[in-house]
Amino acid sequence: MKFLVDTHAHTIASTHAYSTLHDYLNVAKEKGIKLFAITDHGPDMADAPHFWHFVNMRVLPRIIDGVGVLRGIEANIKNQQGDIDFFGDYLKQLDIVLAGFHEPVFPPSTAENHTQALINCIESGKVDIISHPGNPAYPIDIERVAQAAAKHNVALEINNSSFLTSRKGSEKSCRAIALAVKEAGGLLVMGSDSHVAFSLGDFDKAVEVIEAVQFPIERLLNRSPEALLCFLSARGHDSLDEYADLV
């Protein structure tokens, strides 16, 4: 199966990434990708875009040359309370909100602290997807997190870059997460976590994890633009009508 939806990509607005929105659009058209999200790092990261970057995403057309572009963020989980570095009504202006641990903002701690931070973040209702929860630098109680995510309709990400250039040693935990989410009746999403446009929509390693645990395709958000958009609508994002031509 070819997956035509990517929920995790960084532009040069995050200065450790190397591609523009136009670069991503060109690659999306070449690969046949129908919908992707721009999710630059939240403001608490040292090289993140200014807060205004996210506020002003309203100027972006939602469909460009036949490709849907979701206005998003990869926010930083800041503390054990599960707080993130984006807030209030501004969150409602975004189409998709990812959040995860990043060492400059939340230094690795204990498994219990990591677990409680993720559960609190999930329960806050502010976040749609937990990014790279399989990072071995942040061990968690996988079953508790998977159950909380399923209960609150939050997706957990299998991050393809975790098997390539980042977060080495993620394979075991990602497989355990996929299995736990399957058993909890929850949702998974694959993210390329692209920091350069060439890798947009690349999920080869993530697909291996999904297939290894025989994860139900009907609970994988990448299966179609419609699946992701329905999920986001159910999560309370109410500005998605402009994407109707994609489904």
Swiss-Prot record:
Instruction: Recite the UniProt keywords alphabetically.
Output: Hydrolase, Metal-binding, Zinc
| GO BP term, example | bacterial-type flagellum-dependent swarming motility
Tell me which GO cellular component terms the UniProt record holds: cytosol
Q: Does the keyword Translocase apply?
A: no
GO MF annotation terms: phosphatase activity; zinc ion binding
The cofactor binding remark recorded in the entry reads: Binds 3 Zn(2+) ions per subunit.
Q: What are the binding positions for Zn(2+) 1 in this chain?
A: H8, H10, E74, D193
- Annotated Zn(2+) 2 binding lies at H16, H41, H195
Cofactor annotation: Zn(2+)
Instruction: Spell out the Pfam families in the cross-references.
Output: PHP (PF02811)
Q: Which residues cross the membrane?
A: none
Documented EC number(s)? 3.1.3.-
**Binding positions (Zn(2+) 3):** E74, H102, H132
Query: Which protein family is named in the record?
Result: Belongs to the PHP family.
The protein's name is Probable phosphatase swp_1620
Can you name the source organism? Shewanella piezotolerans (strain WP3 / JCM 13877)
